[in-house]
Amino acid sequence: MDHHHHIASRNSSTTSELPSFEPACHNGNGNGWIYDPNQVRYDQSSDQRLSKLTDLVGKHWSIAPPNNPDMNHNLHHHFDHDHSQNDDISMYRQALEVKNEEDLCYNNGSSGGGSLFHDPIESSRSFLDIRLSRPLTDINPSFKPCFKALNVSEFNKKEHQTASLAAVRLGTTNAGKKKRCEEISDEVSKKAKCSEGSTLSPEKELPKAKLRDKITTLQQIVSPFGKTDTASVLQEAITYINFYQEQVKLLSTPYMKNSSMKDPWGGWDREDHNKRGPKHLDLRSRGLCLVPISYTPIAYRDNSATDYWNPTYRGSLYR
């Protein structure tokens, strides 16, 4: 009973201190609505207890309530000073000791009053630790922002690899194009050379063929003593040409009045004349007679017949 009387006295003191609120309108008859502070009822014991504990938190504790036995002892002593030493107060104090930590955790962030939500001690302490010492993003890991650091070196490496692959592909394509162009140019040049060779080869080989044919013909005509080598054939051809030149000179001398040339055979006859006596020097003495072709018989002018007027080859050497 003493305990209940003490709580009632405290309720009367706290309600007397509350400010009075004037009504918005007043009824003149005196029976209208009048604000009565006594009608507002609170849990005065809990409100007063929370306000005292809040003052203790503001004076002695900084952020979170530590597990300090001295502070708990002071708190118990404070309540023992206000209440009596009967069994009801001891039971109330034990309940207060159990709930003091969660009440203090609640009142530390509040201004006193309002609704009171009792949470377990472990959850209230972990909530304060998270709220006061850890960042807000750690409360709910699902909402934690995840930023992946951009590795510039790997990005540059990948970009360099892609650029190198593109350059290699471009180089291979350019090399293939160059090879094709070179092959086409080589084929065109080879075809041009073949066509030029085919056009120029007959002209180059024609003189050689003619010279070969001439040498073969000369070998067939002139074959001195069965010799067919080129040196012997050419030497015999030179001798043959010199003989015909002498014959032309000899036969053309009588028709050339101003000619001082003499017949080489006449020189031989002169020597014989000096030895044996004078002789008449003419062509008839040598068995030669020059007459115009118009006076010769027609039979002798036939090409198929033998020309008796022409001297035989090497006829003068074998006389």
From Swiss-Prot:
InterPro entries: bHLH95_bHLH, bHLH_dom, HLH_DNA-bd_sf, IND-like. Residues 1-23 are annotated as: Disordered. Gene3D superfamilies: Helix-loop-helix DNA-binding domain (4.10.280.10). It is found in: Nucleus. It comes from the Eukaryota. GO terms for molecular function: DNA-binding transcription factor activity, RNA polymerase II-specific; protein dimerization activity; RNA polymerase II cis-regulatory region sequence-specific DNA binding. Keywords: DNA-binding, Nucleus, Transcription, Transcription regulation. One of its GO terms (cellular component) is nucleus. Residues 9-18 have a biased composition (Polar residues). Residues 195-244 form the bHLH domain. GO terms for biological process: regulation of transcription by RNA polymerase II. Homodimer. This is Transcription factor bHLH111.
